[in-house]
């Protein structure tokens, strides 16, 4: 807890989100913009709101987010992870419901590196018999 703000760090792919929540009327601001302006896709908005809707705190908190790196999907996942951690910082009894839904666990899937002699991570060069 920092002042009257609860804090959580979220990560997904190469995106990192720093999330601050405090009691309010449900405003979510991402990098200085309203959430609907920052995330264009409806699925990204849905991903970000999932932990709030699960715990029935959608209209209870004002949320301020700083997110860097990655694309839209990675950033949305990072914000969701950060909101989950901030909610647990606010009220530890929410952890069981959030972990049952799978929001507490960091999604460890990362981009696989390109290997030498391959076109991409797994795509090999075309084989010629003759």
UniProtKB/Swiss-Prot annotation:
It holds the Pfam family Ribosomal_S9. GO terms for cellular component: cytosolic small ribosomal subunit. GO terms for biological process: translation. InterPro entries: Ribosomal_Su5_D2-typ_SF (IPR020568), Ribosomal_uS9 (IPR000754), Ribosomal_uS9_bac/plastid (IPR023035), Ribosomal_uS9_CS (IPR020574), Ribsml_uS5_D2-typ_fold_subgr (IPR014721). PROSITE patterns: RIBOSOMAL_S9 (PS00360). Gene3D superfamilies: 3.30.230.10. NCBIfam families: PRK00132.1 (NF001099). PANTHER family: RIBOSOMAL PROTEIN S9, SMALL RIBOSOMAL SUBUNIT PROTEIN US9M. This is Small ribosomal subunit protein uS9.
């Amino acid at each position: 807890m920092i002042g009257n703000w609860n804090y959580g760090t979220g990560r997904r792919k190469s995106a990192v989100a720093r999330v601050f929540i405090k009691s309010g009327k449900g405003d979510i601001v991402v990098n200085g913009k309203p959430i609907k302006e920052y995330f264009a896709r409806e699925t990204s908005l849905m991903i970000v709101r999932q932990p709030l809707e699960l715990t029935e705190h959608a209209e209870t908190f004002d949320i301020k987010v700083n997110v860097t790196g990655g694309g839209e999907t990675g950033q949305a996942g990072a914000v969701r992870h950060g909101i989950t951690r901030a909610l647990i910082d606010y009220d530890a009894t929410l952890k069981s419901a959030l972990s049952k839904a799978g929001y507490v666990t960091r999604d460890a899937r990362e981009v696989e590196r390109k290997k030498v002699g391959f076109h991409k991570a797994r795509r090999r060069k075309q084989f010629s018999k003759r």
